[in-house]
Amino acid sequence: IEFDIYRNNKHIGKHIFSFEKIENKTIVRSLIDFKISKLGVTLYKYNAEGVETYLDGNLVNFTSSTDQNGKKKYVNIKVQDDEYLIDGSSYKGSAPIEFLIGTWWNHSIVKAPAQISAVSGRVIKQKVTFLGKEKLNLDGKSYNTLHFNFSSNDKKLNKDKKLNTDIWYEEETLNWVKASFKKKGNWEYRLTLID
């Protein structure tokens, strides 16, 4: 699955997922790479790599490393005694296994009481609102979608830590096709390839 990343309607990078199935194990690799430039000068660079490992459909391991404009962040998660053990740059501790990694491709996240940041391991309690069905045109293709908003339950969080993201899933397949959020500009992830 490939997404183009846009900031203020300008293409700045890519988010690519690959899926590998080996018997009852599924490995999901994710790569995000973008940069913000002005007049040929790079102002901000972002690169993240993550690997999710599932056994019989259940997450058993997750690792990620992120370079956020020179600031290093990471997450390592494993399952022990029916809970997640998280070692992340923002959170170290445990979390219930009904929480999901915030990588968006897994539609089940709409039912999760919280998501775990794929960048830092921070646990984000979430409220999910179904906003309706919409027809979207992306990269020359038309999709019938289900539109959701994900927001933070914790009203005490400062503004740049709050979750407020719109996600669109294709109605028939439940594949993720678009994301939209505001953070120092208007951001969109738009599906370009699904294989």
Predicted features by range, described:
Residues 1-79, 101-195:
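Acidic, serine/threonine-rich low-complexity disordered tracts
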Residues 82-100:
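Acidic/charged, solvent-exposed loop-and-adjacent secondary-structure segments enriched in E/D, K/R, S/T
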